[in-house]
Amino acid sequence: MYMLSSDERARLKWACRRGMLELDVIIMPFFEECLDDLPDQEQRDFVSLLTSDDPDLFTWMMGHGRSENPAHAAMVDKIVAHNNSKLR
């Protein structure tokens, strides 16, 4: 499993900060609690997902649409499942 350097982690944490508070609330807990446990490819998928526009991310996270990129769609599913598990 790939371990991020402290600089890489800081840059990625900054990238998790979005222009919409709703996305911060959804994405940051996943970053803080799950990222280190993801396999290398899923970590790369997460980083790639963060390059998406906020309106697209919000639509996908709310379940009102799905990314055409299968890796992004799978990562959104993981993030949403993580957040839903915290509500139980």
From Swiss-Prot:
Ranges that cross the membrane: none
**Is Chaperone among this UniProt entry's keywords?**
yes
User: One GO CC annotation, please?
Assistant: cytoplasm
The UniProt entry lists the main location of this chain as cytoplasm
InterPro entries per the record?
SDH, SDH_sf, SdhE_FAD_assembly_factor
Q: What is any Pfam family matched here? A: Sdh5
Look up the signal peptide feature and give its range.
none
Query: Which GO BP terms sit in this record?
Result: succinate metabolic process
Compartment annotation: Cytoplasm
Keywords in alphabetical order, please: Chaperone, Cytoplasm
Q: What does this protein do?
A: An FAD assembly protein, which accelerates covalent attachment of the cofactor into other proteins. Plays an essential role in the assembly of succinate dehydrogenase (SDH, respiratory complex II), an enzyme complex that is a component of both the tricarboxylic acid cycle and the electron transport chain, and which couples the oxidation of succinate to fumarate with the reduction of ubiquinone (coenzyme Q) to ubiquinol. Required for flavinylation (covalent attachment of FAD) of the flavoprotein subunit SdhA of SDH and other flavinylated proteins as well.
What family name appears in the similarity comment?
A: Belongs to the SdhE FAD assembly factor family.
Instruction: Report the protein name in the record.
Output: FAD assembly factor SdhE
This chain's source organism reads Photobacterium profundum (strain SS9)
Cite the source lineage: Bacteria, Pseudomonadati, Pseudomonadota, Gammaproteobacteria, Vibrionales
**What's the name of its gene?**
sdhE
